[in-house]
Amino acid sequence: VIDFMIVGLPRSGTAWLANWFTTERSICWHEPLWQRSLAELDAMKGAGLFGIADTQLTLMNADELNRHPAKKMIVHRELGDVNFSLAKLGLPAMQDEHKWKLDEIGGYHITFHDLFHVERFRPAAEWLLPMPFDAARYSLLRGLNIQNALAIKEAQEAYIDYLEMQDE
């Protein structure tokens, strides 16, 4: 069963958070909804805590997501910053409705910028996972630009397919 979820728009630090929340006692899979359904992920069993960090969760109905028992961390990033980052990858912009949905999800709300300030991130991390905060590991990961190249490539290919269907 999924123990925790990280919800955010694309380019909002979900890959970085998946790395942070993968520890000796937990695993956080980034963008698993490209390959599996939520029901399939919930049926997975393993040792330790299991979490997902997936931008596609923002497409789900907020009420449905709120009914799921997993703890949720919701990451907010300015829509202009999200869209600027998406444009650099050749991907379409997100709409206002996607950002508003985040407000409807229950859980721990944090901004993208707060992820990179230890005094703001630490309470969120400790809330999501009941384990001691590793400040040395945080300092190391904080400086890394972590991106999921496979998810980016899949999104680009899906967008190209969509554009080609529009031309037919």
Question: What residue spans do the PLM features occupy?
Answer:
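PAPS-dependent sulfotransferase catalytic core
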Residues: V1-F50, A135, S139-L144, A149-L150
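Short coil/turn segments at beta-strand junctions that form active-site/ligand-binding loops
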Residues: I2, A47-G48, H68-K71, G106, ...
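A sequence-composition feature that detects small, non-aromatic residues
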Residues: A15-A18, A39, A43, A47, ...
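Low-complexity, intrinsically disordered/propeptide-like segments
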Residues: T23-E24, M94, Q166
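The conserved 3'-phosphoadenosine-5'-phosphosulfate
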Residues: Q35-L38, L102-E168
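PAPS-dependent sulfotransferase catalytic domain
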Residues: T55-D134
